Amino acid sequence: MAKTYSAGVKEYRETYWMPNYTPKDTDILACFKITPQAGVPREEAAAAVAAESSTGTWTTVWTDLLTDLDYYKGRAYAIEDVPGDDTCFYAFIAYPIDLFEEGSVVNVFTSLVGNVFGFKAVRALRLEDVRFPIAYVMTCNGPPHGIQVERDIMNKYGRPMLGCTIKPKLGLSAKNYGRAVYECLRGGLDFTKDDENVNSQPFMRWRQRFDFVMDAIDKAERETGERKGHYLNVTAPTPEEMYKRAEYAKEIGAPIIMHDYITGGFCANTGLAQWCRDNGVLLHIHRAMHAVLDRNPHHGIHFRVLTKILRLSGGDHLHTGTVVGKLEGDRASTLGWIDLLRESYIKEDRSRGLFFDQDWGSMPGAFAVASGGIHVWHMPALVTIFGDDSVLQFGGGTLGHPWGNAAGACANRVALEACVEARNQGVAIEKEGKDVLTKAAASSPELKIAMETWKEIKFEFDTVDKLDIAHK
């Protein structure tokens, strides 16, 4: 029988709540944490989110008859309690893949975290996880190069890489900035880095910074015989300016550039990743602004989702937190999104906050970057937590060394190599780390001084965004 139009307002659950639906392999699946308004039933709130993030609007419209609404609509198919919190619940929603433009994380986010987050039917809403089917993953280019290609480019194997963010982050002249880069690379680091807010300010224009940094890299490479790099931040006011800076970095021989993927935008990031792939340049990604989106446990976007989006959009490195440093990061959750960044197939694991299986197919992984308030005493834990496919970045933990930048870099290199050697010999370095470092410091005065300088420095603040109680 032909469908007929009936004007008016219906409850969302009449159309979008489908508890008997079995998700398809090609569906994009989302888990939302919903805090409904008082008096709104869970099924109605879940259906409202499914509607507003897919095909629905506040009233029936006659143009629904011009399409197959039953095919295109999002479907709220399951509800679960949030352990330890009866003010909210988990809603699982399935979206047909045809709702989204191929290869466009911009389009995915416009639907999943668009107008629905201002919806009056809910008091708070958080996107906890997304399952991207392999059919969608294959439409995205992902990391420009990936872990193995980067190791081959940099000729570094069998250990984490070492980095350092140049400090003070703002105010240095280009010449003094280049001097700091040289000292750190000459001292033993693999990479140095622009801070996320270093772009092209009056005290240091981008072109002068790029030139002095490349002079520093070339000199450090000649003296050490090792490949070196510096993350030249090409984030800019416009895409045109961003590509202009990227082209110049390539022209002068820079092996790696950098982008602030959230503040710079997903469209810009996807385009830059494609440029890096085409031009043989590595891409470091900073997550500036992520905590605005992911730190509130009831509203926003969980960082595991931002990790997945970055892997689809493209980047060879991503800052992931440190667990042990100054920045937010629960250990189990952090290990979960590190796997999402690096591994090919990740199983659902609620103990690590992973709500879905995720298959990346042959898409390469990216390096996890640990950065923020770390020093040599953290090295055993960092090597244990992050493993070899990571970049451990010590900013103040390098530049704050009493003997200067080169000594700070040397201390970190000695500590890293001691921990990797001990680990390879079967030592439980996270437990025996003090002994490992003390032994190494006996033949490294730089490490000994670093250990004395930072032995009392800890960041023992409770994590705000924890895993829900019963998931641990």
From Swiss-Prot:
UniProt-annotated site: Transition state stabilizer, residues: K326
Keyword annotations: Calvin cycle, Carbon dioxide fixation, Lyase, Magnesium, Metal-binding, Monooxygenase, Oxidoreductase, Photosynthesis
Positions of post-translational N6-carboxylysine modification: K193
Biological-process GO terms, alphabetical: reductive pentose-phosphate cycle
Record-listed Mg(2+) binding positions: K193, D195, E196
GO molecular function: magnesium ion binding; monooxygenase activity; ribulose-bisphosphate carboxylase activity
Top-level taxon of the source organism: Bacteria
EC number: 4.1.1.39
Stored InterPro entries: RuBisCO, RuBisCo_large_chain_AS, RuBisCO_lsu_C, RuBisCO_lsu_C_sf, RuBisCO_lsu_fd_N, RuBisCO_lsu_N_sf, RuBisCO_lsuI
Details of cofactor binding: Binds 1 Mg(2+) ion per subunit.
Uppermost EC category: lyase
Keyword rRNA processing: no
Positions of substrate binding: N115, T165, K169, R287, H319, S371
Cofactors that this protein relies on: Mg(2+)
One Pfam family named in its UniProt record: RuBisCO_large
Reaction catalysed by this enzyme: 2 (2R)-3-phosphoglycerate + 2 H(+) = D-ribulose 1,5-bisphosphate + CO2 + H2O; D-ribulose 1,5-bisphosphate + O2 = 2-phosphoglycolate + (2R)-3-phosphoglycerate + 2 H(+)
Active site: K167, H286
Additional detail: The basic functional RuBisCO is composed of a large chain homodimer in a 'head-to-tail' conformation. In form I RuBisCO this homodimer is arranged in a barrel-like tetramer with the small subunits forming a tetrameric 'cap' on each end of the 'barrel'.
Functional note: RuBisCO catalyzes two reactions: the carboxylation of D-ribulose 1,5-bisphosphate, the primary event in carbon dioxide fixation, as well as the oxidative fragmentation of the pentose substrate. Both reactions occur simultaneously and in competition at the same active site.
Family stated for the protein in its record: Belongs to the RuBisCO large chain family. Type I subfamily.
Subunit structure: Heterohexadecamer of 8 large chains and 8 small chains.
UniProt protein name: Ribulose bisphosphate carboxylase large chain 1
